[in-house]
Amino acid sequence: MSNKEGSGGFRKRKHDNFPHNQRREGKDVNSSSPVMLAFKSFQQELDARHDKYERLVKLSRDITVESKRTIFLLHRITSAPDMEDILTESEIKLDGVRQKIFQVAQELSGEDMHQFHRAITTGLQEYVEAVSFQHFIKTRSLISMDEINKQLIFTTEDNGKENKTPSSDAQDKQFGTWRLRVTPVDYLLGVADLTGELMRMCINSVGNGDIDTPFEVSQFLRQVYDGFSFIGNTGPYEVSKKLYTLKQSLAKVENACYALKVRGSEIPKHMLADVFSVKTEMIDQEEGIS
């Protein structure tokens, strides 16, 4: 039986047909050839992009952490005696976050943002959540994407006063402007995450005897949910996933408002938060079963 017919056969390689002394031996590579020089430049460019990507990931992580700290600080506003002190401190923290975003804008200067968007999207979403949470506490309204982007325009004056990252002398001498635009998807995802923080603020405010905030939050969340419903499944995949979480937050807030309206006079104020937490757990269990 031939090698081709047998199950364990093998095919000879083409160079096996040549005598050993006639095989082509590998030549020494000329490192100074135009082809090698071109590939070396490609290697340097790819390494530079990978390094930039890693720096952006680190900055995005810092933005996420500081934004979360700002959100935790703002949650203290339901129990703090002076709301203005909390808002002032939160503004200082957000200024620090914006300086991190300034460094991102400098890294992306002259680059296509979409090539590095995946590295910074998490931080931008968390920043949108923090700044929109602060804006809601101040005005009981939703901050627009244009307002957020106006806060992310930086000049060399910002670089000299607040930003500590090194820059070239030519760049310092020339009056320049850096900006970073929050994309519509980042904005929508940040607003969707905001609804969860508003739900927590609603429950905490009830525990402190504030019965007006839940109704204000409920009305606001209904408007946000209606807006997201217009997008539905036609928008980005991440937005459609957030829609379910938004609906959960709205249901919990509406349940709290219902209990306040119907049973508010029966339950002491210091026990309302416990009642709502129990009802919230029941809603979570029902949704988990379904």
From Swiss-Prot:
Processing after translation: Sumoylated with SUMO1.
Assembly and interaction partners: Ring-shaped heterooctamer of six TSN and two TSNAX subunits. Interacts with GOLGA3, TSNAXIP1, SUN1 and AKAP9. Interacts with the homodimeric form of C1D following gamma-radiation. Interacts with TSN and C1D in a mutually exclusive manner.
CDD domains referenced in this protein's UniProt entry, alphabetically: Translin-like (cd14805)
Main location: cytoplasm
Keywords from the named record: Cytoplasm, Developmental protein, Differentiation, DNA-binding, Golgi apparatus, Isopeptide bond, Magnesium, Metal-binding, Nucleus, Spermatogenesis, Ubl conjugation
SUPFAM superfamilies: Translin
Chain residues that bind Mg(2+): E129, E197
GO biological process: cell differentiation; regulatory ncRNA-mediated post-transcriptional gene silencing; siRNA processing; spermatogenesis
Cell compartment(s), UniProt: Cytoplasm, Perinuclear region; Golgi apparatus; Nucleus
Position of the Glycyl lysine isopeptide (Lys-Gly) (interchain with G-Cter in SUMO2) cross-link: K279
InterPro entries associated with the record: Translin_C, Translin_fam, Translin_N, Translin_sf
GO cellular component: cytoplasm; cytosol; endoribonuclease complex; Golgi apparatus; nucleoplasm; nucleus; perinuclear region of cytoplasm
Organism: Homo sapiens (Human)
Entry's family note: Belongs to the translin family.
Protein name: Translin-associated protein X
